[in-house]
A protein has these predicted regions:
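Acidic-and-aromatic substrate-binding clefts and catalytic sites of carbohydrate-active enzymes
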Residues: 10-23, 44-57, 82-84, 121, ...
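Alpha-helix-loop-beta-strand connector modules within alpha/beta enzyme cores
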Residues: 58-79, 145-157, 245-253
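Active-site acidic/histidine proton-transfer and metal-coordination neighborhood
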Residues: 25, 84-186
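A structural motif
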Residues: 35-36, 105, 110, 161, ...
Length: 287
């Protein structure tokens, strides 16, 4: 669920009313949308909205599977989390947050856990106006801290490494891929992030073909990138068909490969419906 939509639910007359937020009912409503059979639970909710995600809530969400026959994926916390931090207390606290979330979400039996292996600090460093070589050196050093965090997460939770799907975010993905290979992790491919050139300059097809051996989940959304007088202007998490995504050709590629992994729309409800209608019109065999 998008943050703005969540805020609209709980803010009344300028003040938050957390009693208005019920994740079980939100999931139930989402499953009424045609073609939606996988729900991704954002574990940041547990920290943003007190009492919204508890062991009891997780049990109720798990029971919904008997009613609707759907499955879950889990997006592990990323706000205020930095697994690549060189500040050890911050790094260890980030690991603890991830581990707690995995344990809390276990009753859902998620298909995978989506992980940001680097956070906002690493993203900021990746944007530094230094030489590409210097930025790569610093990012590689931060990836070393991230790798240590991943190892600790796997050790403490004892989950299979391929259950961890590392998302392409604002950080050089060729560096992230080295962590994925080292620990035999999986990949969550966010199309909008790539279209906005957050994780690299490859085309959608080049990224997919290079990494499809590891891709187990899609965050399917549109995005744009423009260079305006030397300034990068980007947008992501757009409804399908409103950005630069080659909808027909990319979806056909997925159909040819018989991709069966979870496909998640990180969009508002109306944008999800708009996106599904676009896919239904352009490439109905993908639904």
């Amino acid at each position: 669920m998008e943050f703005a939509a969540t805020a609209d639910r709980i803010i009344v007359d300028g003040a938050p009313d957390f009693s208005r937020f019920n994740i079980v009912e939100i999931v139930r409503d989402s499953l009424q949308i045609a073609h939606i059979s996988v729900i991704e639970i954002s574990m940041d909710i547990a920290h943003i909205i007190p009492g919204a995600l508890t062991s009891k809530t997780m049990g109720q969400l798990a029971e919904l599977k008997d009613e609707f026959g759907h499955s879950y994926t889990v997006h592990l916390p990323f706000w205020s989390v930095e697994l690549a931090s060189f500040n050890e207390p911050v790094r260890k606290g980030s690991v603890e947050s991830i581990v707690e979330s995995i344990r809390l979400a276990e009753p859902l039996e998620p298909e995978c856990y989506v992980l940001h292996s680097t956070g906002s600090l690493a993203a900021e460093i990746s944007r530094l106006n230094y030489s590409k070589e210097m930025v790569n050196v610093i990012c590689t050093a931060m990836a070393g801290f991230s790798a240590r965090s991943v190892e600790e997460i796997l050790t403490q939770t004892e989950i299979g490494p391929r259950q961890i799907a590392v998302e392409n975010i604002e950080f050089p993905f060729e560096i992230t891929r080295s962590i994925i290979d080292e620990y035999d992790l999986s990949i969550c491919f966010d199309t909008g992030h790539l279209l906005a050139k957050f994780s690299g300059n490859e085309s959608i097809f080049d990224f997919y073909k290079t990494h499809k051996d590891k891709i187990v989940e899609l965050h399917l959304n549109d995005g744009t990138y423009k260079n305006v007088e030397g300034v990068s202007v980007t947008d992501d998490h757009l409804a399908i068909g409103t950005g630069d995504l080659p909808v027909h050709d990319f979806m056909i590629e997925l159909v040819k490969d018989c991709f069966q992994g979870p496909t998640i729309f990180e969009l508002t409800t109306e944008e999800v419906k708009q996106s599904l209608q676009k896919i239904r019109t352009v490439v109905p065999e993908a639904l």
